[in-house]
Every structure is written in C-alpha cells, then in structure tokens.
Amino acid sequence: MQISNDPSSHSGSLTMYLSEINQYGLLSVEEEQALARKFVKGDLAAGHRLVTSNLRFVVKVSYEYRSYGIKMSDLIQEGNIGLMKAVQKFDPDKGIRLISYAVWWIRAYIQNYILKSWSLVKLGTTQAQRKLFFSLARTRRELEKFGAGDGAVVNVDEIANKLNVKASEVREMEQRMGGRDLSLDAPMGEDGGNSHVDFVASAAAPQDDEFADKEEAGLINSRVHMALMRLDPRERFIIEQRVMNERPMTLKELGEHFGFSRERARQLEIRAKDKLKAELAALLAEVDPDAAAALQ
C-alpha cells in the first residue's frame, strides 16, 4: 500500500501535512465497509482511501505522547504504520468502526517506537521507572484538567500522591523527560488563534474522538489483541468461543467442533488460557508492570 506517511517529507513540515490530511473526508459506516470489502479482494485504491480518511486520528493519538521528547513527525509516522497494519487486518463484518480497531495498532506502534528510542539513561532500568515513564505525562494532564480550572498548576507532590511514588522519583523522571516537542501547540497564524492540533480535532467525528481519548482502554485492548495473535488458530478459536463470545460454546460443543471429547476440550481450554495470560503479561510488562503482575 503506497502512501506518503512521513510528515517530515512535506516542505512545510507539520503545518502542510495537517492541512493536507484534513482534505480527506471522513467515511460513513457504509462507505467504510464497502471500501474494506474491496480492499480484501485486492483493491489497493480502496485501502489507500481507508488510510487517508483516518490519518487525522493518528495525529490526535500521537499528540497524547508529545511529552516524551520525540519529534511529533516521528510519532505520527509510526502511528501511520500502525494504521496501515490495521487496515490490512480489518474485518468489516465484525460490527465496529475501523478507527476503533485501528487505535489499538496505532498506540502499539507508537509505544514500541518510544521504548526503542529512549535510552536506558532516560527511561530507567527498573519496572517502577518504566511504569512511571508512561504514567507521568498522562497523570499531569489529568490533574490539570480536573484541577482548579484551566491552566491550574499541578505540583510534584500531587503527582507523586496520585501515582503512589516519592516526589523525588517524579522530579528525577521529569528531568529525564525534558525537551518535549511543542510544534502542534504552536498557533497556526500570527493572530495567535487555534493551534494545529485544534485544527485536527475540530474535524474529528465526536464518537471516534471520544474513543480515541480513552487511553487506558485502548492500551489494554491493543495488548489483548496482540496476545491473541500470538496463539495458534485453534487456541485463538477456543479463547474467542469460550471467553470472548457473548454466547460461549459449551465444552461439549467445542469438542464436537474439533472431533474430540469434552475432557480433551477442557484440557485444551486451560492450556489456551494459560498461554494467553503468559503472552498478555509479557506485552503489558512493557508499559504497566502492575497489570502484568496481576496476571501471574
């Protein structure tokens, strides 16, 4: 699938890139499903349209990671790769919008890029430091948003209390994370009006915008999906039918499906669940050691 997914390749950098991607209209549910089915049959133009119509959402998700000292253009580029991966794997018959599925992949690619890009000196070597790394910026934004009105200053002690860590650990990590990229916060014109990210947000569909803001849910869902993809087809089928289905198969039905006994079906279910827990714990450990430990 060919697409210019690198914001830094545009002569006007992010300004021109944001203007360009907002020229691509949003798709209705019917249009999205029709294009997805065409893409499954090999229509690359349909796949290109699915990608371009959702590029603005990649920018919004990337903006959430702006405090990690990495250029926004790099974060957006990685998010775009995640979007294209999602388009390749999207099933229009599952009953969800593409962006609701794609946000898992977008976040996963961005987070993996951040982990690879940060040196151990900045990121820290312990699990507690890694957790603080991914929690600090988000927690500060939450406290500022729900604090004493717009522009409220949040001190280190408030953040430390929220994260249940020492204030000295927060100060140390903030020093490591110095040098955030504010290019999207800059006003778009000389009159100091809306910022670039405001321009992107204004064109977003409300329901998808709300979904994209649910960072924690998106993160966990992305890890669950990635863990499922590491199972073999039979294990994945067992988990989907016995755990994730609204009307789960009975062990008897599962055994009949594969042609073996109820007891054998039970044994395979236990094995599939154990493997899924191990895979999910390994993935969650990258960003949330506590969640990973809970699975052990």
UniProtKB/Swiss-Prot annotation:
A biological process from GO: DNA-templated transcription initiation
Gene3D superfamilies assigned: 1.20.140.160, RNA Polymerase Primary Sigma Factor (1.10.601.10)
Residue spans binding DNA: 251-270
Keywords, in A-Z order: DNA-binding, Sigma factor, Transcription, Transcription regulation
Keyword Transcription regulation among UniProt keywords: yes
Stored Pfam families: Sigma70_r1_2, Sigma70_r2, Sigma70_r4
Annotated GO MF terms: DNA binding; sigma factor activity
Motif Polymerase core binding location, chain numbering: 74-87
Keyword Ion transport: no
NCBIfam families with a match to the protein in the record: PRK06596.1 (NF005143), sigma70-ECF (TIGR02937)
PANTHER family in the cross-refs: RNA POLYMERASE SIGMA FACTOR RPOH, SIGMA FACTOR RPOH HEAT SHOCK RELATED
Role description: Sigma factors are initiation factors that promote the attachment of RNA polymerase to specific initiation sites and are then released.
Family: Belongs to the sigma-70 factor family.
Protein name (record): RNA polymerase sigma-B factor
Source organism of the structure: Stigmatella aurantiaca (strain DW4/3-1)
Gene: sigB
